C-alpha cells in the first residue's frame, strides 16, 4: 500500500474524534454537573428587626420573656374587684330601700283602719273627761272639802282632773300599742297582724270607756 493512501486513511479516521460536540450535548452536560442550590442561613434577630419587618413571630418574643416578668404581668391591680364591691353595695342598698317601701306601705294599709277606729274611741273618752273637768268647779278657786257658791264641793273636781291627766297618759299611742310585743306569743304567726293591734288597743280603750260610763252614771 502506498504511503499516501495510509496517511489519508488515518486522517479520515481522526476527523470524527476532533469534531465539535452537537448543540444538544453541549446544553445537557452542564445541567447534570451543576451543584444543588444552597439556602442562606437564617438571619439573627436584632434590635432593628421590627423596623425592617424581619422580626420573629410574637410567640417567639413571649417565650423569650423572663419568667418573673410574665408572672408580674398577671399580678397587676385591676378595677374589677372595686367595681364588683361598688355594685354589690349599691344593689344591697337598693334592695333594702325597695323592701322597706313595700312593707311600710303594706303596714300602713293594714294598720290605718285599726288605728282610726281606736283613735275615735279614745277621742270620745278624752272629750267626755275634758267636758266634765270644764263643767266642774275649778280646784284652784276652792279648797278640798270646801263648798263653793253653787253648793258643790271641790273634791270631785280634783278627782276628775286627776282622772283626765291619767287618761291622757295611758291613752297615748305608745301606751295603747305598747303591748303588741306581749301579744306576739299569744297570737299565731299565720294570723293577720291587725289582730295584734286590735287586741293590744282594745284592752286599754275598753277599760277607759267603762270608767267614763261609770262616772257619767254617778253624776246623773
UniProtKB/Swiss-Prot annotation:
Compositional bias per record (Polar residues), positions renumbered to this chain: 1-11
Subunit structure comment from the entry: May form a complex with LTO1.
Disulphide bonds in the chain: none
PANTHER family named among the record's database cross-references: PROTEIN YAE1 HOMOLOG
Keyword Cytoplasm: yes
Protein family: Belongs to the YAE1 family.
Comp. bias (Pro residues): 33-43
Example GO biological process: protein maturation
Span list, region Disordered: 1-81
Name this polypeptide is given: Protein YAE1
Pfam families per the UniProt record, alphabetical: Yae1_N
Lineage: Eukaryota, Fungi, Dikarya, Ascomycota, Pezizomycotina
Subcellular location: Cytoplasm; Nucleus
Highest rank taxon of the organism: Eukaryota
InterPro entries with a match to the protein in the record: Essential_protein_Yae1_N, Yae1-like
Region (deca-GX3 motif): 91-131
Keywords: Cytoplasm, Nucleus
A cellular component annotation (GO) from this entry: nucleus
Biological role stated in the UniProt entry: The complex LTO1:YAE1 may function as a target specific adapter that probably recruits apo-RPLI1 to the cytosolic iron-sulfur protein assembly (CIA) complex machinery. May be required for biogenesis of the large ribosomal subunit and initiation of translation.
Amino acid at each position: 500500500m502506498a504511503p499516501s493512501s495510509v496517511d489519508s486513511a488515518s486522517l479520515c479516521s481522526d476527523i470524527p474524534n476532533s469534531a465539535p460536540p452537537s448543540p444538544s450535548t453541549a446544553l445537557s452536560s452542564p445541567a447534570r454537573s451543576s451543584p444543588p442550590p444552597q439556602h442562606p442561613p437564617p438571619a439573627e434577630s436584632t434590635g432593628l428587626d421590627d423596623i425592617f419587618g424581619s422580626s420573629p413571630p410574637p410567640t417567639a418574643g413571649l417565650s423569650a420573656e423572663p419568667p418573673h416578668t410574665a408572672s408580674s404581668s398577671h399580678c397587676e391591680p385591676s378595677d374589677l374587684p372595686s367595681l364588683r364591691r361598688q355594685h354589690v353595695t349599691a344593689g344591697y342598698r337598693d334592695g333594702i330601700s325597695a323592701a322597706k317601701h313595700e312593707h311600710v306601705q303594706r303596714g300602713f294599709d293594714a294598720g290605718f283602719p285599726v288605728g282610726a277606729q281606736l283613735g275615735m274611741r279614745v277621742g270620745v273618752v278624752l272629750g267626755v273627761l275634758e267636758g266634765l273637768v270644764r263643767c266642774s268647779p275649778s280646784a284652784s278657786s276652792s279648797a278640798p272639802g270646801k263648798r263653793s257658791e253653787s253648793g258643790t264641793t271641790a273634791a270631785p273636781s280634783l278627782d276628775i282632773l286627776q282622772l283626765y291627766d291619767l287618761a291622757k297618759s295611758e291613752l297615748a299611742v305608745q301606751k295603747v300599742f305598747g303591748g303588741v310585743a306581749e301579744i306576739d306569743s299569744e297570737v299565731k304567726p299565720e294570723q293577720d297582724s291587725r289582730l295584734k293591734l286590735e287586741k293590744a288597743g282594745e284592752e286599754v280603750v275598753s277599760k277607759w270607756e267603762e270608767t267614763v260610763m261609770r262616772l257619767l252614771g254617778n253624776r246623773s
